[in-house]
């Protein structure tokens, strides 16, 4: 296994993809799970489905485990949201949950393109409801993602490297 694997989670609009890009720009190994691991599947079985919706956004659990089992790099960050996280949560040393207040989330979602997740009124309403309930987010260390991106990533890297040491 990589010396330490970390999951960066949070509801849509909290900054998971931005964190992933920033980690990569710093030369750290980061997987954009929503683009590299995701497919439409049953969150309990992992079986592919034609069904569409938030609840069917799952990651390839075998691929997560495969990447996490690599001996290199020293630190590996998996960024994104998955409805089947319980199928692979055990490979992570820690889960970092990005949090923002409702007004920041609403502003970020309003800036999305109509074809991006959260770009329609219905999707924004669902995301704001999920933000209020946190029902699809694993427990973890809360990271205030209303701060500038560099500060958010600094906090994650500091916590990850203190855990790895």
PLM regions: where:
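Hydrophobic anchor at the beta1->P-loop junction of P-loop NTPases
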Residues: 8
